[in-house]
């Protein structure tokens, strides 16, 4: 019953999103507005509160150090494969980052609580060191005329990144403790906590609304998704093996690493397409891997 209490609300939210699209209760523009509200105004406070209490120990540093070469190798392989086998301009973006924002953080909050979201936030910031350069390279030749400087600036000024760094700074410096002493800290926590409430339901609704698996290029979609899954599985085994060597590793760190490795490719990938074929293909890959994520989530919820 405990598992059902976790899983059923998720399936209901996703199902409502799918129903809303099928019955045309909302337009894509309206759903996009919901996503932008959550990404810009709700998830940043979650990360802020979580990072305030974050403890950056050996295990956190270990996951950061491990993740960088893993994503670097997969990205380099993707660029090479793009030349020889998969001639899709945005192909490398499918291997440069996982979707921590729209799905990783909400699922992490549901499983482990908002106070542990910083663990996923650390992985999100770490993957940015690889995904941002890959995004710049891919976006520089989309044919849409988006300047590289503009793209980099947009990523670096992301509310999620800014609020995460602010939370770390206030927490680790001890400044938040001083604000707590004069009563200001409590007001900040209550305000940010209130803003964070819609995150899980809104984002899961959006996932259901945007789910798409076109019959066009279905074999190619399954093949690329399978490759992505194998890369993620190998990365998970390596990272879990290294964490095994680190003394006194918190079990939550292992679970969050496992959850991260099951996440789909970044939902930014379709937006970097040069044509409809690339958009359909990458959207299909992301949607298929999202199904894998939700199945994995149920397994993690049952055993964590």
PLM feature spans:
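Alpha-helical transmembrane segments of multi-pass small-molecule/ion transporters
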Residues: 1-304
């Amino acid at each position: 019953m405990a598992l059902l209490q976790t899983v059923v609300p998720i399936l209901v939210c996703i199902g409502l999103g799918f129903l809303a699209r099928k019955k045309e209760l909302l337009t894509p523009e309206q759903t996009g507005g919901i996503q932008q509200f959550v990404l810009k105004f709700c998830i940043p406070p979650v990360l802020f509160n979580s990072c305030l209490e974050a403890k950056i120990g050996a295990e956190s540093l270990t996951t950061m150090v491990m993740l960088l070469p893993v994503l670097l190798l997969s990205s380099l392989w993707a660029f090479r494969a793009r030349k020889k086998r998969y001639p899709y301009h945005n192909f490398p973006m499918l291997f440069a980052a996982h979707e921590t924002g729209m799905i990783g953080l909400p699922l992490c909050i549901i499983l482990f609580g908002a106070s542990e979201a910083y663990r996923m936030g650390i992985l999100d910031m770490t993957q940015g060191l690889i995904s941002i350069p890959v995004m710049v390279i891919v976006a520089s030749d989309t044919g849409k005329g988006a300047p590289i400087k503009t793209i980099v600036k947009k990523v670096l000024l992301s509310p999620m990144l800014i609020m995460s760094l602010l939370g770390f700074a206030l927490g680790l410096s001890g400044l938040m403790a001083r604000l707590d002493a004069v009563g200001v800290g409590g007001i900040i926590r209550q305000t940010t906590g209130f803003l964070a409430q819609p995150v899980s339901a809104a984002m899961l609704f959006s996932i259901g609304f945007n789910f798409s698996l076109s019959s066009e290029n279905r074999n190619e979609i399954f093949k690329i998704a399978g490759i992505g899954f194998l890369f993620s599985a190998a990365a998970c085994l390596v990272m879990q093996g290294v964490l095994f060597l680190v003394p006194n590793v918190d079990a939550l760190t292992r679970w969050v690493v496992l959850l991260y490795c099951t996440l789909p490719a970044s939902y930014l990938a379709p937006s970097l397409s040069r044509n409809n074929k690339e958009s359909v293909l990458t959207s299909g890959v992301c949607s298929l891997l999202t199904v894998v994520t939700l199945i994995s989530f149920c397994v993690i919820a049952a055993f964590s």
